[in-house]
Amino acid sequence: MQAINLTDHFLIAMPRLEDSFFAKTLTYICEHNEQGALGLVVNRSTDLSVEKLLTQLGMSPQDPALSNLPVLLGGPVQVDNGFVLHEPVGAWRFTLSSNVVTGLTASIDILQAVADCQGPEKILVALGYSGWAAGQLEQELAQNAWLTVPAQSRILFELSFEERLPAAMKLLGIDFFNLSNEVGHA
């Protein structure tokens, strides 16, 4: 069996996915290799804005638009840690490149740059991440827990978090409400 690589793809939770955290989620896969996968849920927000988060970290945000940018709940792993998905990749400490333009950074330097209006052009800030051990995601895919589709920057950075799941579904020509819990074969 040939290994799959879902880096820079969306995972769309199927209705039958029994894990309540991932129900009706859209997850962006930042890295997927033989050791496992790492991603961020990109359609579930917290009650915290990026402006409030930066202020809580002792920073003085300069951009008023940050008060309208929600912090996302990226996943159930390390929910006390922040992760910034951004374009362009840039030269931040602790950055993982998902593709030539999109990076995931888990260091304070990028947050300080965002507060000072010197950060990347496009950002999503999340608390926590989603992780899969080696072979775990492949097993979940075989159980029809997820649909996959190549990610689009437009969906990540130009749409509100509520619009992201339906937009990703539309890439597949599917309406989420038409999905069934039942698996069948033709």
UniProtKB/Swiss-Prot annotation:
One protein family per Pfam: DUF179
Coiled-coil ranges (or none): none
Transmembrane segments: none
Gene3D superfamilies on file: VC0467-like
Organism superkingdom: Bacteria
InterPro entries: AlgH-like
One GO CC term on file: cytosol
Family: Belongs to the UPF0301 (AlgH) family.
Protein name per Swiss-Prot or TrEMBL: UPF0301 protein Neut_0448
